[in-house]
Amino acid sequence: MGRSFYHFLMTYRDPKLTDQKTEFANNAYRDHSFPKQTRNYHILCDYLEFNAPYLPGMSIFDELWDAYLLDEEKNKH
């Protein structure tokens, strides 16, 4: 079993960059209620839609979710 989406997202953290993916990662890090252990797309979507005003649009999450799935598949073997 691989890592959670949160742990994947943390690879995008950087205090000096200001692109949307990095800002999402930095804000999720500061969000103490973020579902850190889940690998479930629907749980993450529901949480972000209702509890993450720092995410300007779900397309950022969707891009990172796709990258997460590719990374999980690559590291499966």
UniProtKB/Swiss-Prot annotation:
Spell out the SUPFAM superfamilies in the cross-references.
YozE-like (SSF140652)
Q: Which InterPro entries match?
A: UPF0346, YozE_SAM-like, YozE_SAM-like_sf
What family does the database annotate?
Belongs to the UPF0346 family.
Would you tell me the protein name for this molecule?
A: UPF0346 protein lmo1857
This chain's source organism reads: Listeria monocytogenes serovar 1/2a (strain ATCC BAA-679 / EGD-e)
The organism's taxonomy opens as:
Bacteria, Bacillati, Bacillota, Bacilli, Bacillales
